[in-house]
């Protein structure tokens, strides 16, 4: 198995390094990751400037000022030849639960892999301590994919409780929960009197029902949530058509 490994915390982050070491025990791994922390960069793709790479002494490749999406795009199309069999993103320092996935660079890296036609996993730890647990879970999932390929065409978003491996209760297939809208902005002034703004914390949980990723992780289970690139709200198509007709702007012009 040939694995392209990326993240949004940066090429030297502990999560990606622990995971790379674990994966190299049974797979060929190429790390292509941002040269710095790019958390919250979502699916941003660099189009207005060239990208440079730096190969680290251990063979990992850092994309200078690159986003997670840049890294996977370059990794699949230029830097890893032959092309990888799968894209893995993580281990993220902190969870990517509920609608956090909208902003997540970790999830975006996996989404880019899927968009380029490859199976993809995004792996996040609900904390900053037990990276070895998340690495072990990831290896189990990848070995399962080797034995029995999963042909859903979906991304697997994996969130792991920050616990020792022997305290993990199991794995649940979940849906994304949701949060209340975030509304905190912190304003400061620089020495010249100009305002500086800091984005505040995420909103509190709104939907953390028993079948959500929030609930599973809180109860000590690994949450695996299938995600997809296609954002079409199919159930709303007929509703929108009816509304356009009633509003007098539908149909042929």
Swiss-Prot record:
The keyword Metal-binding applies. Binds 1 divalent metal cation per subunit. SUPFAM superfamilies: SurE-like (SSF64167). InterPro entries: SurE, SurE-like_Pase/nucleotidase, SurE-like_sf. Keywords: Cytoplasm, Hydrolase, Metal-binding, Nucleotide-binding. Its cofactor is a divalent metal cation. A divalent metal cation binds at residues 8-9, 39, 92. The keyword Hydrolase applies. One of its GO terms (cellular component) is cytoplasm. Belongs to the SurE nucleotidase family. Nucleotidase with a broad substrate specificity as it can dephosphorylate various ribo- and deoxyribonucleoside 5'-monophosphates and ribonucleoside 3'-monophosphates with highest affinity to 3'-AMP. Also hydrolyzes polyphosphate (exopolyphosphatase activity) with the preference for short-chain-length substrates (P20-25). Might be involved in the regulation of dNTP and NTP pools, and in the turnover of 3'-mononucleotides produced by numerous intracellular RNases (T1, T2, and F) during the degradation of various RNAs. PANTHER family: 5'-NUCLEOTIDASE SURE, 5'_3'-NUCLEOTIDASE SURE. This is 5'/3'-nucleotidase SurE. It comes from Serratia proteamaculans (strain 568). The lineage of its organism: Bacteria, Pseudomonadati, Pseudomonadota, Gammaproteobacteria, Enterobacterales.
């Amino acid at each position: 198995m040939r694995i392209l490994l990326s993240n949004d915390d940066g090429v030297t982050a502990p999560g990606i390094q622990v995971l790379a070491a674990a994966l190299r025990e049974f797979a060929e791994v190429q790390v292509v990751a941002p040269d710095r922390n790019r958390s919250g960069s979502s699916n941003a793709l660099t189009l207005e400037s060239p990208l440079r790479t730096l190969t680290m002494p251990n063979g990992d490749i850092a994309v200078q000022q690159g986003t997670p999406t840049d890294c996977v795009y370059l990794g699949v199309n230029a830097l890893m030849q032959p092309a990888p069999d799968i894209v893995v993103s993580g281990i993220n320092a902190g969870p990517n639960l509920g609608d956090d996935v909208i902003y997540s660079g970790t999830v975006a890296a996996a989404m880019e892999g899927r968009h380029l036609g490859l199976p993809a996993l995004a792996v996040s730890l609900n904390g900053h301590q037990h990276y070895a647990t998340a690495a072990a879970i990831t290896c189990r999932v990848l070995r399962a994919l080797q034995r029995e390929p999963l042909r859903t065409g979906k991304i697997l978003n994996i969130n792991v409780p920050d616990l020792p491996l022997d305290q993990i209760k199991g794995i649940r297939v979940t849906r994304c929960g949701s949060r209340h809208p975030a509304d905190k902005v912190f304003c400061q002034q620089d020495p010249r009197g100009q305002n500086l703004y800091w984005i505040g914390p995420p909103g509190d949980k709104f939907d953390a029902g028993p079948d959500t990723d929030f609930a599973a992780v809180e109860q000590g289970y690994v949450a695996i949530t299938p995600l997809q690139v296609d954002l079409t709200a199919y159930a709303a198509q007929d509703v929108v058509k009816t509304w356009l007709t009633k509003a007098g702007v539908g149909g042929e012009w």
